[in-house]
């Protein structure tokens, strides 16, 4: 199993939408073939309803020709990255390979796990 997007995988993904996606929808960048649109995971309350919504939206986006997903550990208290993971599992069962999908993330943030603690300073100093 691939641990990330590859040229071969993203090319295969784009080929699935040949004749369906508009001309120029897919383009080469960073030695990958990426969709001109992506889906982000930044906004929303940290709750189960939003989690389910994000997971479903990511699955729908990938099935519709979007292979760029933006997320980060600090989005919705780590929940968005977990939603991306849940969506990737669903997509794998639908025949989409990890090597077909570009996941963009960020590093260097300290963030609570799941929700905002009552005392953030204490949380970070004790964790």
Question: Which residues does each PLM region occupy?
Answer:
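N-terminal binding-site loop/beta-alpha segment at the start of enzyme catalytic domains
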Residues: 1-105, 111-114
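Surface-exposed, active-site-proximal loop segments in enzymatic domains
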Residues: 112-126
């Amino acid at each position: 199993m691939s641990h990330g997007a590859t040229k071969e995988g993203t090319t295969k993904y784009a080929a699935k939408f040949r004749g369906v996606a508009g001309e120029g929808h897919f383009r080469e960048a960073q030695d990958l073939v990426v969709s001109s649109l992506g889906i982000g995971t930044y906004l929303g309350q940290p709750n189960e309803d939003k989690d389910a919504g994000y997971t479903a939206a990511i699955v729908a986006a990938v099935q519709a020709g979007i292979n760029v997903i933006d997320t980060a550990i600090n989005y919705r208290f780590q929940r968005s990255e977990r939603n991306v993971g849940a969506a990737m599992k669903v997509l794998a069962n639908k025949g989409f390979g990890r090597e077909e999908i570009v996941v963009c993330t960020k590093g260097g943030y300290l963030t609570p796990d799941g929700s905002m603690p009552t005392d953030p300073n204490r949380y970070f100093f004790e964790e």
